[in-house]
Design a protein with these regions (language model features):
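N-terminal loops that bind phosphate or other acidic moieties
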Residues: 1-165
Length: 165
């Protein structure tokens, strides 16, 4: 079983941080989810003025077996095409990362296509897509543990590169 050492946030600064956010030159709560995110980042860093150091966005790609039931917006071919598109800077996520200075890591954990030779894609493939959960378990317990481990490893890698968010 995979365990993570994620400690509860120290809430002692919450009232002070919330007051600072509420008293910015804007209507209270007008930034919606962004205000919640700002509060969370301040609590993580335990400061009223957080800074992001080498922020990273991890994009994990995989195909889902239930797609075979035609319930997805797009066919599975779109997954590998989009993964390649992301390496060329053509996705919305690329624009976000460029705009805000985030490092983008594109990780293949289960795309039903061989992307191993594509520069810019980290190959950590567990399987060639998941099973159709309408008929069987989408993944085995072992595959699920492997997927969580890959996520943990990628976060560790980003942290070693100086990323704290």
């Amino acid at each position: 079983m995979t365990t993570f050492n994620i400690y509860p946030l120290d809430d002692s600064l919450r009232p002070t941080i919330q007051s600072k956010i509420d008293n910015l030159n804007k209507p209270k709560g007008s930034l919606g989810r962004l205000e919640e995110l700002a509060l969370q980042i301040c609590l993580i860093e335990q400061t009223l003025s957080p800074t992001l150091h080498h922020p990273s966005h991890l994009l994990f790609g995989a195909d889902h077996g239930i797609e075979r039931e035609r319930v997805s917006v797009s066919p599975r071919e779109v997954t590998w095409q989009q993964m390649i598109n992301f390496t060329r800077g053509g996705g919305g996520v690329n624009m976000f990362c460029r705009q805000y200075g985030f490092d983008l890591k594109i990780i293949d954990v289960g795309v039903d296509y061989d992307l191993s030779s594509i520069e810019g894609i980290i190959s950590r493939k567990i399987a060639w897509g998941t099973n159709n959960f309408l008929h069987e378990a989408a993944m085995s317990q072992e595959e699920m543990e492997q997927a969580l481990g890959i996520g943990r490893d990628m976060v560790d890698c980003c942290q070693k590169e100086g990323c704290q968010v």
